[in-house]
Structures are given as structure tokens and as C-alpha cells.
Amino acid sequence: MTSAKPAPLNRLRQLWREGRPTFGAIATIPSIQTVQIMARSGIDWIIVDLEHGPIDLGSAHAMITATAGTPCVPMVRIAANEPWLAKAPMDLGALGINFPMICNREDAEKAVRSVRYPPKGDRLWGPFHAPFRWGV
């Protein structure tokens, strides 16, 4: 008896490793239904935009959850390269953060540290939403 290998949690990493292009959309309207339709359309990723529109964390959580059961990877764009802005979306189940204004190496290192756990980063464990969303 053989067991099927589970699909990767974040399939974007696999697609990028293979050098394949990915396609997605940026959601600026707080609509669960729109995200469900887009996630089922065959796109690879959706970025929930917390920087340029009226989407709050509650709406972002619902929009992230709306990708469940699809291969679409939910990500969130935050308003600034500040670690505290990246924490909640990651804890809510986002599989990536789109950071604005990365202008140099220090900016990039700060962004990476904010989404990685120690010893490689500064992110703390938020056990409330993401584990239930992703079954971990």
C-alpha cells in the first residue's frame, strides 16, 4: 500500500523552484465571495491588500479563509515594513506577506526576520487561527 504525498502547503515555493511563472490577483475590496470566485478560477495566489483600501483584519481573515479547499495561496500586503503589521496576517493564515518599500538590504532583512521564527527570525507563535485553517 502506498500513500500519496500531500500537496505542499505553499505551492508557490514549488512552482518558483521549478522556474514556472505564477499568476494571481490583488484583492482591494473586502468581499469573501470575490475571493472565493478568484481562488477557484485557477490563479496561483491572491494578495489581500491591507494598504490601499478598506480591508481590516477581520475581513482579511475571512478572505484568507475563503481560499480554503483551493490551490490558491493567500497572501497579504501590509501598509509598511513593520514587524507588528506582519504578525496578525500570518497568525490568521496568510502564507506570505507582500512588504512595501523594500529599498535596500536592511529593509529586506527586517522583513524576512518578521515572518520567520527564532533562531532565524523574530516572529512569535500565535496558535489561534492559522493551525485550524491549515490543519497543523
Where do the protein language model's features map onto the residues?
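Glycine-enriched alpha-helix->loop->beta-strand junction motifs that scaffold or abut catalytic
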Residues: 41-45, 91-96, 116
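Glycine-rich, proline-tolerant flexible connector loops at the mouths of alpha/beta enzymes
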Residues: 34-62
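Conserved anion-binding
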Residues: 84, 96-136
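Short, acidic/polar
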Residues: 27-41, 80-88
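Hydrophobic faces of well-ordered beta-strands that scaffold small-molecule active sites
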Residues: 21-27, 46-48, 74-78, 97-99
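N-terminal amphipathic alpha-helix/helix-capping segment at the start of soluble metabolic enzymes
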Residues: 1-26, 136
